[in-house]
Amino acid sequence: MKKKILVSRLYPKEGIRLLEKENFHLTLWEEKRPMTQVELIEKAKSHHALLCTLTEKIDSHFLTQCSHLEIISQFAVGYDNIDIDAATGFGIPVGFTPDAMSEATADIAFGLMIAVARKMFFLHKTIINGRWGYFNPTGNLGFELKDKTLGIFGLGRIGVKMAKRCKN
């Protein structure tokens, strides 16, 4: 019998393919909204495992209704939404992906840094509102990041990745 996994969100296709390759039966929630807890409980009742995100509340109420689950794992760095003590009490192991979003988060931070330095948000709004007028080289360029010092608060996974992007 194939093990059934409830996937509560649209996940990267590579991950879905890996699970399908291992012969799991996947039920994918494809709506562009999170499941309500009632929907989550009803769907999880017929599955062996749950693959979720931070928006699903996995509390003692959920776990009491779905104590048959063999594992819960979530695509997120943290797991504040999961009652670990209750899951442990039901003998359900919980997994998470501590480095899943580090590269993307560092990329976004890097992009935001450039966008702010070069006034991209302001200039985008100016263009959208039809107020572009003329190009002002001294007023519209913002400032160069070259030879600037970057302060990074914390050198965890994301801070280190950001530092490597900004090195030299």
Regions found by a protein language model. Name each.
Residues 90, 98-149, 161:
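Phosphate-binding beta-alpha-beta segment of Rossmann-like dinucleotide-binding domains, i.e.
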